[in-house]
Regions:
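Extended, charge-biased low-complexity segments
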Residues: 67, 72-74, 78, 84
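Post-HEXXH active-site segment of zinc metalloproteases
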Residues: 133, 149-183
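Histidine-centered divalent metal-coordination motifs
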Residues: 141, 145
C-alpha cells in the first residue's frame, strides 16, 4: 500500500498546483490526448466482441485441464478505415486453475498492427467472469495507438527512437539493457497517452456500471503498474550506471542518436512526473464526464473488483 500512497501523493500534488477543478478540465483534452471518439469506438468494440464470444464454439487445450478458449474475429469501421479485431477468450474453471496454468497457455498478444489494421488481444475470465477493467483498458490503449498512427500516417514503430527502445526491450527481462529500454518506452508521449486512455476507459465503465472506489481501479491498472515498474527500473539503472554491458548499450544509443546517459535519464524523469500528472487529470476528467463526486481519497478500499460475464456485458 505504501507504493500506491506515494504515487497517489505525487498525483495529488501535481493535480492541485495552482489549478482549480475547472482549470484542469479545460486543458485536459489537449494535454492528455483523451479522445471521445476513441472512447466511443472502444465501448462499441467491447460490445461486438462480447456478442461474438457468445456465438463461438468452446475449445479445449491439450494437457491443460480446467481451461477452455474461444478464438474470434470481427471487423469494425474506425476512423475512416476498416479494422480487424482478432481475440482469444480464455476461461478458467476457478482461480486455482488460473494461478497454475495461465503462464503456460498460449495467448494472443495485445497489440495493433498499423500496416494490416489489425487489433489483437486476449480476454481472460474465471468461472465465466471477465476482468472487465483490463478488457476496457487494453482495447482503448491499443486503439489510442491506432488513432495516433492515423494522424501521422505511419506506424509509431517506424521512428528511430522507437526502434532503439524496442531493440533494447528485446533483451532478457532482467538485463539492464531491457530495463533501460523499458523506462524509455514507458515515458514516450505516445505510450503515456495510450496508458492513460486505457485507465480512462476502465474508470468510465466503472462509474457508469459499478461505482467501485477509484483507489481500487487505479491499484489494478496497467498504468499504475507501469509507473511502479518505471520507478524501480530507473533506480536499478542509476545504481548500476558503471556496468560494462549497460555502457555498451549507451554508447550504441549515443552513436545512433547523439543522446547521452544524462539526457536519457532527464527525459525519463520528466516523463515520470508527466505520467503521474496525466493519471491525476484522467481521474478528474472521468469523474467529470460521469457527473460523480471525487472519491479518490476514500479509505474504505475493497480487495476485489467486479468481473462481468459475457451475458452481463451484452446487456450493459
Amino acid at each position: 500500500m505504501g507504493g500506491l500512497n506515494n504515487i497517489l501523493n505525487d498525483i495529488n500534488s501535481v493535480l492541485i498546483e495552482g489549478k482549480t477543478h475547472n482549470d484542469v478540465c479545460k486543458i485536459i483534452t489537449e494535454e492528455l490526448g483523451i479522445n471521445d471518439k476513441v472512447a466511443e469506438v472502444s465501448l462499441d468494440i467491447m460490445k461486438e466482441i462480447s456478442k461474438d464470444i457468445s456465438m463461438q464454439p468452446k475449445q479445449y487445450f491439450t494437457n491443460i485441464p480446467g481451461a477452455s478458449f474461444k478464438d474470434g474475429l470481427i471487423t469494425y469501421q474506425a476512423f475512416g478505415k476498416k479494422i480487424t479485431v482478432k481475440y482469444r477468450y480464455i476461461n478458467y474453471r476457478d482461480k486455482s486453475y488460473f494461478d497454475k496454468y495461465d503462464a503456460n497457455i498460449r495467448q494472443m498478444p495485445n497489440d495493433f498492427n498499423y500496416a494490416t489494421k489489425t487489433l489483437r488481444l486476449t480476454i481472460k475470465s474465471i468461472s465465466g467472469n471477465i476482468d472487465i477493467y483490463t478488457f476496457a483498458d487494453t482495447i482503448q490503449h491499443e486503439l489510442e495507438h491506432y488513432f495516433q498512427e492515423t494522424k501521422i500516417n505511419h506506424s509509431l514503430a517506424d521512428s528511430n527512437w522507437y526502434k532503439i527502445v524496442l531493440k533494447c526491450k528485446n533483451r532478457p527481462r532482467q538485463s539492464l539493457t531491457y530495463m533501460l529500454g523499458d523506462i524509455m518506452y514507458i515515458t514516450t508521449k505516445c505510450e503515456e497517452e495510450a496508458f492513460t486512455n486505457g485507465l480512462y476507459a476502465a474508470l468510465v465503465y466503472n462509474y457508469k456500471n459499478d461505482n467501485i472506489p477509484t483507489y481500487e481501479i487505479l491499484d489494478n491498472s496497467p498504468v499504475y503498474n507501469a509507473l511502479l515498474t518505471l520507478r524501480k527500473e530507473k533506480e536499478i539503472i542509476l545504481n548500476n550506471k558503471d556496468d560494462i554491458s549497460l555502457n555498451k548499450t549507451l554508447s550504441a544509443i549515443k552513436k545512433a542518436t547523439s543522446k547521452n546517459f544524462d539526457y536519457i535519464i532527464s527525459k525519463v524523469e520528466k516523463g515520470e512526473k508527466e505520467l503521474a500528472r496525466r493519471i491525476g487529470r484522467v481521474i478528474v476528467k472521468a469523474q467529470k464526464d460521469c457527473n460523480i463526486p471525487n472519491d479518490m481519497w476514500i479509505n474504505n478500499r475493497r480487495n476485489t473488483y467486479t468481473k462481468k460475464t459475457v451475458e452481463e456485458l451484452n446487456n450493459a
